[in-house]
Amino acid sequence: MTSIGTGYDLSNSVFSPDGRNFQVEYAVKAVENGTTSIGIKCNDGVVFAVEKLITSKLLVPQKNVKIQVVDRHIGCVYSGLIPDGRHLVNRGREEAASFKKLYKTPIPIPAFADRLGQYVQAHTLYNSVRPFGVSTIFGGVDKNGAHLYMLEPSGSYWGYKGAATGKGRQSAKAELEKLVDHHPEGLSAREAVKQAAKIIYLAHEDNKEKDFELEISWCSLSETNGLHKFVKGDLLQEAIDFAQKEINGDDDEDEDDSDNVMSSDDENAPVATNANATTDQEGDIHLE
């Protein structure tokens, strides 16, 4: 079957002969062009981090937040079309408020994931709407512990130990997999903050010609009493310093290895001398 739309991408409610919805696939492309966002599930909470590119010197620092508070115990971050992400955040807030008004208790995060997933999936069924060009990572803490989910433009959502989306998702996923392998017992919330900063800095290496701001938030039973809050001040600076030190340390090791190889080659190289040169008793070489 062909990999292009050939007319089957003109409507959101039509499948191609090989069972594909091209409008959803195009929405995924919009997500892949977005800035890198990650989420890490730790021992007693979750940590979110996002790379915010500075597109203009006129932007006010720390004002254009991308990590959002959905409910007191739920946070989210997204990659893709920013207006679509803001709309989903507002819809999520409505769902959380509606649940609390009806049942007199904060919405469980799995129930929140199901409601928001159904809303996103409904936008893949009708000709009068289009899919959301955004992938959302959300999570928090409820009475059953910590939860982390990622919601895709198709409306499907999955629970994760670590999730990444956006342009730098491949390198970010590789680092998250290393974390899971090296820390099977899990991370503390503070350690997860440092690792999240490091992963965002590593993911930014492919786009290093552009400046960016690092934004981090967390929701932890031990650190924030189960509330979703932004990481600021000394802790944020400590995470940034840790990330830069780790990355610069790796670069220094690579340079040392290359220097050692060059030194070894120099030792084995023959010494060129002039045929008319003579050596005195003290070993100095003089040209005749």
Curated annotation (Swiss-Prot):
Q: Which organism is it from?
A: Saccharomyces cerevisiae (strain ATCC 204508 / S288c) (Baker's yeast)
* GO molecular-function terms, A-Z: mRNA binding
Misc note:
Present with 12000 molecules/cell in log phase SD medium.
The family assignment reads: Belongs to the peptidase T1A family.
- SUPFAM superfamilies, A to Z: N-terminal nucleophile aminohydrolases (Ntn hydrolases) (SSF56235)
Q: Subunit structure of this entry?
A: The 26S proteasome consists of a 20S proteasome core and two 19S regulatory subunits. The 20S proteasome core is composed of 28 subunits that are arranged in four stacked rings, resulting in a barrel-shaped structure. The two end rings are each formed by seven alpha subunits, and the two central rings are each formed by seven beta subunits. The catalytic chamber with the active sites is on the inside of the barrel.
**What's the name of the protein?**
Probable proteasome subunit alpha type-7
What the entry lists under InterPro entries is as follows: Ntn_hydrolases_N, Proteasome_alpha, Proteasome_alpha-type, Proteasome_asu_N, Proteasome_sua/b
Q: What does this protein do?
A: The proteasome degrades poly-ubiquitinated proteins in the cytoplasm and in the nucleus. It is essential for the regulated turnover of proteins and for the removal of misfolded proteins. The proteasome is a multicatalytic proteinase complex that is characterized by its ability to cleave peptides with Arg, Phe, Tyr, Leu, and Glu adjacent to the leaving group at neutral or slightly basic pH. It has an ATP-dependent proteolytic activity.
Report what the Swiss-Prot or TrEMBL entry states about this protein's PTMs: The alpha and beta forms are probably products of the same gene with different post-translational modifications.
